[in-house]
Amino acid sequence: MKKNKIISEVICILMILALLCGCQDSKKYPTEGKESPSQTEEQVLWPSYEQANVLSDGSLALVDLTHKDDGYICARLLQEVTGIKLQIQKDDKKYNYDLKTTDFSTFPVNMENGTYTIKILQQIEGTRYAICASTSMEVNLTNDLAPYLYPNQIVDYTIDSYVYKKSFELVKEDRDDLTRIAHLFKYVVDTLDYDDQKAKDVSETFVLPDIDGSLKSHKGICFDYAASLAALCRIQGIPAKVIVGWTDIEYHAWVEIYLKDKGWINPKIYFKKEKWNLVDPTFSDSKNSDYEGKYDEVYHY
C-alpha cells in the first residue's frame, strides 16, 4: 500500500546520533508507533481569557495571568500604540514579546515551576524600555507538556485556520502518533520551498511566522517551517516545541516533538530515509539536508 511505503521510507531504520545525545547505549528510539486513538476536534486545546488575575498599567496593556498553571498567559494592548513589550522572566532567563494588537495573544509559560516576573515595558528610545507595570507569580504547572499543546504568538492558529483543517486531513487514517508525525513532517517538507528573498528581507528584524500564508504560498523561512510543523502536531494533541538557537551554519529554528511512553526525543529528530535525525524541516528541504552539526538551543516556544 502507498501508506505503508511512505512510512517504511521514513522510519525503517533506527540511528542514534551519539555525538549529540552523549548516551549511545542508554537511549533507544522507536522504530514503530504504539497504537493510540485519533485526536478529535473537541479535544484540541484553546486558550481562554477569563481575566480573573490580571496585570495592567491601566492605559497601555493588560496581561491575563489566570491560566499560568495551564502553561500560558495572555496579553493585549489597551489602545493602538507601538513600542510595547511583554517580558516573561524566571531566574536569569527572559522572553520579550512585542504586543501588536488589542486582541488577546497567547504566550507560553515554559520555564518549569517556580517564581516568574511579568513586566509590561514601553519603548523610550532604541533598545531602552521603561517598566510600566510588574508583578511576580508562582507557577505550578498542571501538566509539564501544556505550554506546547496550545497555540501561541509564535505557533499561531485558530479553528478557522487552514493549518487546522489540514492537520486533521493528513492523519485521518493513521493509528499511532509516530505515523502521524511522519505524515505531518512529510507534508511540510513537500509543501514548502525556502524563501530566500524573505530571508533577506527579515535578516535585520524579527518577524513572526505566517503559518497559513506559508502553506498556501508554498514558501517560507525556517521560522515558518518550524511553526507549521509544531502547529500541525499540537492540533493532533502531540506536544511540539519550536526551538530557536544557533547551528554551525546560522541562527535557526527547528522542532522537538514528544512521544507518549518515550518522552521528548533527544537528540531532536526529523524523519529522513533510513535514519533518525533532527526534526529540522528546513534543513531537510534544503542543500543542508545532511547537516549533523551542533544545535545550541536559546529559546523554546
Explain the meaning of each model-derived region.
Residues 2-176, 264-265, 297-301:
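N-terminal accessory/pre-domain segments preceding catalytic cores
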Residues 116, 129, 148, 185-187, ...:
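Aromatic side chains
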Residues 153-217, 265, 273-287, 295-301:
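Secondary-structure boundary elements
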Residues 217-223:
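A short, highly charged nucleic-acid-interacting micro-segment common to nuclease
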Residues 224-301:
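Hydrophobic/aromatic-rich core segments of domains that either
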